[in-house]
C-alpha cells in the first residue's frame, strides 16, 4: 500500500455526506474517513473511537494515532499521511493529498461538518498552525 493508494481511495469518497460517527459511503465523519479508507484498502481496522462526542477536552485522537501509526515531522508529510488538528476544544483529522489546482502545494481530504460532506482543499499555513500531530499508516513504506 502506498500513500497514492490512500489518496486514490479518499478521493473516491469526495462528496459523501458528513455523518457524525459515520463509517460507510452512506456517511462519514473526520475519523470515519481514514477508517473507511483503510477498510477499502484491506488494512486492519484501527477504529477505536466509538461513541465519541463532537468536541472533546482530552487528547484521545492524538494519543490513539501515536499508539497506532508512525509519527512524522510536519516538514516530512506526504500524500496519504494523516493530520490531527486541535483548535480549542475541537479535534479534526484529515488525509494529506497532492493538490492538482496548485501543483506546488499539498491539500487535504476531510469529512468536514461545515461543508456537510467529504471535501478537498489546499493545505494552508493557517490549518498547519493548528496541527498537533502528523502520522503515517504503519503499512505504508516511507
Protein language model annotation of sequence segments:
Residues 1-16, 120-142:
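Non-catalytic ligand/cofactor/substrate-binding and regulatory segments of enzyme domains
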Residues 2-7, 48-117, 123:
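...with weaker cross-activation on analogous glycine-rich loops/strands in unrelated enzymes
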Residues 19-23, 45-50:
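Surface-exposed patches in mature extracellular/periplasmic domains of secreted proteins
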Residues 21-41:
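Active-site nucleophilic cysteine motif
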Residues 24, 114, 137-140:
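Short, solvent-exposed coil/turn elements at secondary-structure transition points
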Residues 39-46, 101:
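Bacterial peptidoglycan biogenesis and beta-lactam-recognition machinery
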Amino acid at each position: 500500500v502506498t500513500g497514492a493508494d490512500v489518496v486514490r481511495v479518499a478521493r473516491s469518497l469526495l462528496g459523501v455526506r458528513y455523518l457524525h460517527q459515520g463509517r460507510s459511503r452512506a456517511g462519514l465523519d473526520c475519523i470515519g474517513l481514514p477508517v473507511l479508507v483503510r477498510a477499502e484498502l484491506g488494512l486492519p481496522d484501527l477504529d477505536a473511537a466509538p461513541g465519541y462526542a463532537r468536541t472533546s477536552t482530552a487528547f484521545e485522537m492524538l494519543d490513539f494515532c501515536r499508539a497506532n501509526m508512525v509519527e512524522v515531522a510536519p516538514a516530512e508529510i506526504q500524500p496519504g499521511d494523516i493530520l490531527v488538528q486541535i483548535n480549542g476544544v475541537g479535534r479534526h483529522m484529515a488525509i494529506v493529498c497532492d493538490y492538482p489546482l496548485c501543483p506546488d502545494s499539498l491539500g487535504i481530504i476531510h469529512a468536514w461538518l461545515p461543508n456537510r460532506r467529504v471535501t478537498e482543499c489546499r493545505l494552508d499555513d493557517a490549518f498547519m498552525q493548528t496541527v498537533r500531530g502528523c502520522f503515517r499508516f504503519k503499512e505504508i513504506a516511507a
